[in-house]
């Protein structure tokens, strides 16, 4: 007997075709895809002609465990993920204590094995003192460098330290590209003489376009100098797209997040600190240039940078208000809504959110709906239109910057390793994800 049979689905192919088919899953893999399958299975999902996608891989989340589990933890964050059709996530190291050695990585892996309902992988955080660990810990999806200070205590901004990290080892380096010196200069210029808390939109002026562009340029030059595999996280400006369009070696990839595609500085007026993040949301016009970067291939993939804080924390006056917002459970509906508005194609969504992240991080057998691949899937209702509601958010933060926005295309079922984990609004008990492995040799 097989584990799972999905009947009468529109099965999404990498080229955007959606032929009707049944999908048979067993032992965590897609066993067979055919127009009609007659087989006994422990569970049958009647897809009703809805669209079946490969599970989304979110390559940048902050699930806050250990150290800030009042905001999120691996259990709540992964529940939010599967609600949004995300079946695998890569989690960042800026927790407390930070993930900077094998002991901390092992702790996270053990915790995720007991609580995460999606598949999981973890970055190791770079400091100026842990060069040996950066290249020896296993398994890690990459090295995270904060070139500009953000949530947590990880910061590497001195050129000599960056040179040592890029020059030693072969593991992928993922950079938060904001220039710390310029942040400090802009902070002094714009905040030091104020007697009243400034408006939240000053955040986008402090961490301005040049703050991002300087750091992106530094990282790119280091990658070229040492031939090092580089991934630039959350591009936010049109200037970065222009820069990379003209000078992006084969070993360099980059991403954008929905916040920078669907929000801009006008949103501060209504949402205030809820849209404060690093790098910040930008002036109108940048989103169009980021979209162009996606379409032309300068930008490779989409992540969320899911970075939750409580509303009590977010409502503090600037600059005490922390940067970051939830996003893991709305990214796919946002992109499916964009698809239906003609901003992208299904093939592009699949490349940006499924197969692309698997390729960037060397994750085998994920990201495509093919026989022999892992049975990580999401069944979506492309006709379902409803607003994002804070009271329905699974993240422990309990809110979304997109609350009230009408989105079309919501997951009905999410399947991890051939087992249904999210079922029409609820997470089933007893299903856990598995640790991801990473191969950068191919």
Tell me the role of every PLM-derived stretch.
Residues 275, 318-319, 387-403:
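Short, surface-exposed loop/helix-turn segments at secondary-structure junctions
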Residues 132-146, 151-302:
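Histidine/acidic residue-rich metal-binding segments in metalloenzymes
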Residues 197, 201-218, 222-227, 274, ...:
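His/Asp/Glu-enriched, well-ordered alpha-helical/loop segment
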Residues 12-22, 359-391, 405, 424:
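Acidic, glycine-enriched loop/beta-strand segments at the rims
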Residues 36-52:
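Active-site metal-binding motif and surrounding structural segment of the metallo-beta-lactamase
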Residues 50-115:
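Metal-associated gating/positioning segment near the N- to mid-region
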Residues 1-40:
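N-terminal metal-binding scaffold of metallo-dependent hydrolase/deaminase domains
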Residues 110-126:
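A glycine-rich helix N-cap at a beta->alpha junction
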């Amino acid at each position: 007997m097989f584990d799972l049979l999905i009947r009468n689905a529109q099965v999404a192919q990498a080229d955007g075709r959606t032929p009707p088919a049944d999908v048979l899953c067993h032992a965590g893999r897609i066993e067979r895809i055919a127009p009609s399958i007659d087989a006994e299975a422990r569970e049958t999902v009647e897809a009703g002609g809805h669209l079946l996608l490969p599970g989304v891989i979110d390559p940048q989340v902050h699930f806050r465990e250990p150290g800030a589990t009042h905001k999120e933890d691996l259990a709540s964050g992964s529940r939010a993920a599967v609600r949004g059709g995300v079946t695998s996530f890569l989690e960042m190291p800026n927790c407390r204590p930070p993930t900077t050695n094998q002991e901390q990585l092992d702790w996270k892996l053990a915790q995720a094995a007991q609580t995460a309902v999606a598949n999981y992988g973890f970055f190791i955080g770079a400091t100026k003192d842990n060069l040996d660990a950066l290249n020896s810990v296993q398994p890690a999806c990459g090295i995270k460098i904060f070139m500009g200070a953000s949530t947590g205590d990880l910061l590497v901004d001195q050129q000599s330290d960056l040179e040592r990290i890029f020059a030693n080892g072969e593991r992928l380096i993922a950079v938060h590209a904001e220039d710390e010196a310029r942040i400090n200069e802009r902070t002094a210029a714009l905040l030091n003489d104020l007697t009243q808390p400034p408006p939240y939109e000053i955040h986008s002026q402090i961490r301005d376009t040049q703050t991002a562009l300087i750091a992106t340029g530094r990282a790119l030059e280091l990658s070229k100098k040492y031939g090092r595999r580089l991934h630039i996280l959350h591009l936010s400006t049109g200037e970065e797209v222009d820069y990379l369009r003209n000078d992006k070696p084969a070993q360099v990839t980059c991403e954008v997040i929905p916040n920078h595609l669907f929000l801009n500085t006008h949103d501060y007026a209504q949402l205030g600190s809820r849209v404060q993040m690093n790098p910040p949301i930008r002036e109108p016009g940048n989103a169009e240039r980021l979209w162009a970067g996606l379409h032309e291939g300068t930008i490779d993939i989409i992540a969320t940078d899911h970075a939750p804080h409580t509303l009590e924390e977010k409502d503090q006056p600037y600059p005490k208000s922390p940067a970051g917002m939830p996003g893991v459970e709305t990214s796919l509906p946002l992109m499916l809504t964009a698809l239906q508005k003609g901003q992208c194609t299904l093939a592009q969504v699949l490349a940006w959110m499924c197969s692309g992240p698997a390729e960037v991080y060397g994750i085998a057998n994920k990201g495509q709906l093919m026989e022999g691949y892992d049975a990580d899937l999401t069944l979506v209702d492309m006709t379902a239109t409803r607003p994002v509601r804070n009271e329905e958010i699974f993240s422990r933060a309990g809110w979304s910057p997109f609350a009230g926005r009408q989105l079309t295309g919501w997951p009905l079922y999410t399947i991890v390793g051939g087992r249904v984990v999210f079922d029409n609004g609820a997470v089933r008990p007893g299903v856990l994800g598995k640790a991801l492995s990473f191969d950068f040799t191919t």
